[in-house]
Amino acid sequence: KTKPKRGSNSLKVMIDGDISLNNTSKNFEYTPKNNLLNIPLPATSSLITELAALNILEEDIREGALLFFEEPEAHLHLAAQRQMARFIVTLINKGCHMIITTHSDTFLQQLNNLLMLDKISKYNPAILSELEIEKDEIMSNDKVAVYDFYCDSSKTQVNRLDFGKYGFVADSLNEVIFKLATETQRINDEIDN
């Protein structure tokens, strides 16, 4: 078996194992951590199959590379979404350029946290160790441009978002969250009455 070399262990941690090429079958296989069983990639979870290509190609991602990443949060549970945001920031800090689309308020908030921590850590460096975040997992907001795509009945509006006190605020995501919270509260009130 030939194992790809790795830079960061972030993806390896997310998949909780290793992906390697079986030299006999010429197919990639997944080996769960602390297990000798090799699983054909198509038989693994969507989290593993979705991250496989990036995991395999990670060693070839160089400074100046341009990566397009559609919904990096797709098929990832919330903890893995947070790890993915950190991994993306480390790639950007290594000089990669990225174009990312997302529908996830959780993913956007994790990116916001990593951007805001860049400012906060300048006057409170201990906060990084307190939150278990590495220096290469935060970055300045001036490396980022965020656009909010909002669809109404006849057209799509595209608005560049400003980085404010609490990061980038995407109204299109917040409106849906507010409606869900209002609906949930109304249902809970009805149950309690």
Per-range role (PLM):
Residues 70-72:
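Walker B catalytic acidic pair
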Residues 97-106, 111:
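Conserved H-loop
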Residues 83-85:
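Conserved hydrophobic alpha-helix in the ABC-type ATPase nucleotide-binding domain
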Residues 1-66, 94, 135-193:
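Phosphate-coordinating catalytic segments in nucleotide- and nucleic-acid-processing enzymes
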Residues 110, 116-141:
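Mixed-charge, low-complexity intrinsically disordered segments
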